[in-house]
A protein has these predicted regions:
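Catalytic machinery of carbohydrate-active enzymes
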Residues: 1-318
Length: 318
């Protein structure tokens, strides 16, 4: 999900600066991120039918291809299209592996969005400096506002409890340490896979509001839009929150901000909080190494996180 959110600045600039008709290929599960985006002419949803996808895109007679994923599937697609005007993002996978295994930093000091613009640079597409985007409807906003009355008051904190891999997910016992130290109301956000953790937190802290497993990606985004502060693991919803310029306290375990996937253009007072110095913890590009009782995110500084959150909201409401 986060990868799709992070492409939106390039999509916007390609449309606005070139006047281009922009088509985007994306997995069906994440196509909603681009719904109602005025810079996207058409979304091609991929569900595994490569030949059908290729036929549909060939029918569009594309003039240029910008591959911002650079995966096996996207490489196969761009090779099959045989478009002479093609840009490809450089992912620096080898350099990430070297850092993960040996803690030797050979990575460029730049955000992945800047890498995306480098891939598009040969076409005259330049970074306009604006944030990522998701375009919500009034109906989506109204639905969550009516369903969760608590989000209509301020200030309150959105906590994104989920993550794609265990190595990026703050454990339940750490949330149990953080939440009682927060002095403002809390709203939980997550998918169906996070309902067990949400239930345990709701049982321990009855005053919190849980939207976990109840909303679509876009509806969860509508909740984040109304938050005063977001605390999130390194996950797609962290990037969605950055679309709204929210202050974000991002929590890092097996992944590191050094890889360039930190919140883009997040709000003032945002901070990236790492579980332990990178030299002493497990690092994986996707955060998918095995975790156990020694999970690095058990060592997140609960007091520091709560102090920062309380300070940010106290200053905001002063």
């Amino acid at each position: 999900m986060g990868d799709v959110v992070l492409t939106t600045p390039v999509i916007r600039c390609a449309h606005e600066q070139l006047g281009a008709e922009v088509h985007v290929v994306v997995k069906k599960a994440f196509a909603g991120i681009l719904a109602h985006n005025p810079h996207v002419h058409r979304v091609h949803e991929f569900e595994g039918d490569f030949d059908g996808l290729l036929t549909a895109i060939r029918a569009e007679n594309v003039d240029m291809v910008i591959d911002l994923h650079n995966s096996l599937r996207s490489k196969r697609l761009r090779k099959a299209l045989k478009c002479p005007n093609t840009g490809v993002v450089r992912k620096h996978s080898l350099q990430k592996w070297i850092f993960s295994e040996f803690r030797v930093n050979l990575l460029p000091d730049c955000h992945v969005v800047e890498k995306y613009f480098l891939a598009a640079g040969n076409f005259g597409i330049e970074n306009d400096g604006a944030p990522c985007e998701i375009f919500l409807t009034d109906e989506e906003r109204e639905k969550v506002a009516q369903r969760y009355q608590q989000i209509n008051s301020t200030p309150w904190i959105a906590i994104v409890i989920g993550a794609a891999h265990a190595g990026k997910q703050t454990p339940l016992k750490k949330w149990m340490e953080i939440i009682p130290k927060l002095i403002h109301p809390v709203v939980l956000i997550g998918g169906p896979e996070d309902t067990e953790m949400a239930g345990a937190l709701k049982e321990a802290f009855p005053s919190i509001v849980s939207t976990v497993g109840e909303l679509s990606i876009r509806e969860s985004a509508a909740v984040l839009e109304k938050a005063s502060l977001v605390i999130a693991n390194d996950t797609g919803m962290m990037h969605v929150a950055s679309c709204f310029g929210k202050p974000i306290l991002s929590l890092w375990g097996q992944t590191v901000p050094l890889f360039g996937m930190y919140p883009y253009k997040a709000g003032k007072a945002s901070e990236m909080i790492e579980a332990d110095p990178a030299s002493r913890r497990k690092i994986a590009k996707l955060g998918n190494k095995r975790v156990g009782s020694d999970h690095d995110m058990n060592y997140l500084p609960a007091d520091h996180i709560a102090i920062l959150a309380n300070k940010i909201l106290n200053e905001e409401s002063a």
